[in-house]
Amino acid sequence: MTTEKATFGAGCFWGVEETFRKLKGVSSTAVGYAGGNRENPSYEDVCSDETGHAEVVQVEFDPSQITYDQILDVFWSNHNPTTLNRQGPDVGTQYRSVIFYHSPEQKAAAEKSKQEISESGRFNRLVVTQIEPAPKFWRAEEYHQRYLEKRGQSHCAI
């Protein structure tokens, strides 16, 4: 099986990971940090809002079972891409909406989907999602991995 990677930031990574993990064709997920300026940051480092990292989910998927475009649709459907550095009550640059692409094809698909969602009328505000080349992914501490599943929860309850 040939797999591909996709990396997304869409708020607190616990709920984002749970959403992607359940998709048919997704072989694995990992939560972590990306897009910042500190090597191997801790959760506390990232929460300080001084590292520039986003909380992200790295998704490994089988493109013969689920396409990158389908994964993008799930991304857009499960967060608010119009709020800068915030999702719900969570505020800070680590909660920004970001797509980290792993290939020129992913970049093109992400840009096209952002344009389509922006023009769809679904949101009455500007879509602020960033689209950037995938930087080094720093895996988060083990207690964050599959956080909601370990606690028998299906979503974040704040």
Language model features by range: what are they?
Residues M1-I158:
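Flexible coil/turn and secondary-structure edge motifs
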